[in-house]
Regions:
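P-loop NTPase catalytic cores that bind/hydrolyze ATP
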Residues: 1-9, 30-31, 36
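Inter-helical turn/loop segments and adjacent helix faces that build the functional surface
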Residues: 8-24
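Short conserved micro-motifs at the rims of enzyme active sites and ligand-binding pockets
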Residues: 10-14, 134-136, 164-172, 239
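Intrinsically disordered, low-complexity N-proximal targeting/linker segments that flank membranes
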Residues: 27, 34-127, 132, 146
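Generic hydrophobic alpha-helical scaffold/packing signal
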Residues: 30, 34, 125-128, 154, ...
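Short beta-strand-alpha-helix junction that forms the catalytic/metal-binding core
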Residues: 122, 134-162
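Polybasic, low-complexity binding patches
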Residues: 142-147, 164-195
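C-terminal, well-folded lobe of enzymatic/effector domains
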Residues: 182-249
Length: 249
């Protein structure tokens, strides 16, 4: 990133004279560096390759190239598909850098200035609560579900989150009376009551696990589509559909 900035700032090799085009390029470079910071975390770009990858990125001037909407979609869908392979029951993975960077980008656009200046703390909340999901899986002897998937996560003010304990937003009538539910839906969870109705069903037989899995997968897929659109809007990326031949850079 530093190499790209210097190459564009001093394009003639004279480090005493700033390139005449720098004023036109610096805004683009600043935006690209932020985009690649997010993109490289989601794709785990620097997880392998070492020094050779550093030289390759610098030589190709990688960070001066705009990431297309299609490349973003492929990267996000690949990350989502990998996370949906998890089979969690008792042990649920904690959020990692990929989940945090996606959530942070999304909530840039939904948190107000007052939210950001507030001393209130925020939790990463499982929309389908961990303990409740564990019980549903155990009741029908299931092999596990991706409870920690990004599509099941949101930020929630600490006080609001902990008051509902192991229930979802819609199950505790007392909890609903003490919060602004529409505010939670529009600002934090991006859900509607219909999205979580399947959690109120009984799953008691072994064959019920496939029904539970289907409902949960449908919920995650639907909500992840919402998250992608929110992230694109927040970062100013044009949403583009992709086909199977699209590759991640």
């Amino acid at each position: 990133m530093i190499s790209t900035t210097f190459k564009e700032m001093y394009s003639n090799g004279d480090y005493n004279t700033v390139s005449p085009q720098w004023n036109d390029k610096k805004e683009m470079i600043a935006k690209n560096l932020m985009m690649y910071y997010v993109y490289d975390i989601i794709t785990n770009y620097w997880s392998e390759g070492g020094t050779n990858k550093i030289h390759s990125a610098a030589k190709l001037n990688r960070y001066a190239t705009l990431i297309s909407g299609r490349e973003w979609i492929v990267a996000l869908d690949s990350f989502f598909e990998r996370s949906m392979l998890r089979a969690e029951t008792k042990k649920v993975a904690s959020p990692k850098s990929e989940e945090y960077v996606i959530l942070n980008c999304i909530y840039l656009n939904t948190f107000t200035a007052m939210d950001q200046l507030s001393i209130e703390r925020f939790d990463v909340e499982h929309i389908e609560p961990k303990e409740q999901m564990r019980k549903l899986i155990e009741n029908c002897s299931g092999e596990g579900l991706p409870i920690s998937c990004i599509a099941n996560l949101c930020y929630l003010p600490e006080g609001i989150n902990r008051s509902k304990q192991d229930r979802n937003f819609y199950q505790d009538k007392k909890y609903i009376k003490n919060i602004d539910l529409s505010d939670v839906e529009n600002k934090y969870s991006f859900t509607e009551v219909e999205d979580l109705e399947w959690m109120d069903m009984l799953y008691e037989k072994k064959e019920d696990f496939e029904v539970l899995k289907e409902y949960y997968t449908e919920f995650c897929t639907k909500r992840f589509t919402k998250l992608k659109h929110l992230l694109f809007n927040s970062l100013g990326i044009k949403y583009e559909e992709v086909d199977d031949s699209q590759e991640v850079i």
